[in-house]
Amino acid sequence: MFVSGQNRGASNGATFERRNPLDGELASLAPAATLEDATAAVQAASSAFPAWAALGVRERRMLLLTAADVLKSYTSDFTAAMAAETGASNQWASFNVELAAEIMREAAALVTRIDGQVIPSDTHGCLSMAIRQPAGVVLGIAPWNAPVILGVRALATPLACGNTVVLKGSELCPATHSLIVQALHQAGFPAGVVNFLTNAPSDAGAIVEKMVADPAVRRVNFTGSTHVGRLVAQICARYLKPSVLELGGKAPALILDDADLDNAVEAIAFGAFANSGQVCMSTERIIVDESIAQSFIAKLRDRVSTLPIGDPRHETVVLGSVVDNATVYRCNELISDALDNGAKLVCGGMSETTLMQATLLDRVTPAMRIFHEETFGPVKAIVRVNSEKAAIACANDTKMGLSSAVFSRDVARALRVARRLRTGICHINGPTVQDEAQVPFGGINDSGWGHFGGQAGIDAFTDLRWMTVKNTTGDNVF
């Protein structure tokens, strides 16, 4: 843990272990924060807030830019930590660090974009303004699956806006998340501006509620499952704390009858199997027009069935270990249910270990669990449809709404389809897994609310205030 510029253990000395999902080897040992530790972290951030909020934008920008460079220099450390704690491939870890550094650089660019507005007033001699100010302490709760990207995203824009931060790391990758805070400390961030807590899994709910309930915490951002996101939203509502939630997904990729199949195959191979499918934007439903289904599925099978798989600690792979045996069990259940109800196995299959091969199931229907449930693993459903209208209806047949993709050589047609998809994000002729630091990233419906990047991020992590200046006398009401 890191509080008030110092590394520290839990106040009662408690710790918890994270073990490698593949062989059970000890990956990290981290402090198990107490409620007193949670309060101390918030108090440290609150004490540092006035000075940080008042800091000039040039100094804030330079610290964020320096932090981006330091993060990049930690690439090998992040790669080793992610492989040990979550089974992530070197490729995925490097991508995480690269994008995280860009998020930090984009945050540095935001410091001079926090502007306001002069509003015409009905009152004679009155200057009426809308201004944005830092909100206060921001609690960021980051997940394990893209730990560097999402850990940095939880704090970069809030810091750029003049807030101080408490980052609550994931119980599944405490060492990985701690490297982010070490990088910011090395970059020169003042004590208390960034604080970091780790907690035992059984204590997560109590720790989060303790911090959300603290009057100093003015914003909460959370990235994780829809189930846990609902719990976080309930806690935030109880204490009237605004939140930004990026939750689960069931991303559809629509392969229309005029699609460039080779391009679609490459995009879906990445979108479906990056980090073994353990990405909120991961392509979960491959919706393909019946007229091109056979050719497309054959090409996709050939592409993904040869993806390298293995232990990322010892070899270069695309598919490393999934995060735990619960993922294996869940995916095996979904495969079994689909096959029992008429689906056809294209490649892959059930797994006995956390090294799971890329699996495609054809002829999936709404009668199967995998049509509706997020796999969050390398098991993907192919749904055949007979028209553009049916493809859109199939894509929208879910409560989730994070990412989507449409493949067509006719861009006007693809745009028409994209406008009818109920998702916060849609990519035409590109993978569902995409992110850029400056974009308004976020979902709708059961995939959450609010946005992280660009102007939307500024709006989320500042208070909008109305202020007036009366420069004449007289005109008394009474």
What are these model-predicted stretches?
Residues 13-16, 283, 402:
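Short loop/turn microsegments at loop-to-beta-strand junctions
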Residues 24, 60, 82, 104, ...:
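Residue-level signal for inorganic ion chemistry
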Residues 203, 227-365, 428, 476-477:
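ALDH superfamily catalytic-core signature
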Residues 25-29, 217, 254, 308, ...:
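Conserved C-terminal structural/oligomerization subdomain of aldehyde/semialdehyde dehydrogenase
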Residues 1-126:
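N-terminal Rossmann-like NAD(P)+-binding subdomain of aldehyde/semialdehyde dehydrogenases
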Residues 26-33, 48-54, 139-140, 253-256, ...:
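Short, well-ordered beta-strand elements within core beta-sheets of diverse protein domains
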Residues 117-263, 385:
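Rossmann-like NAD(P) dinucleotide-binding subdomain of oxidoreductase/dehydrogenase enzymes
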Residues 49, 53, 68-75, 79, ...:
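Structural signal for hydrophobic packing residues in well-ordered secondary-structure cores
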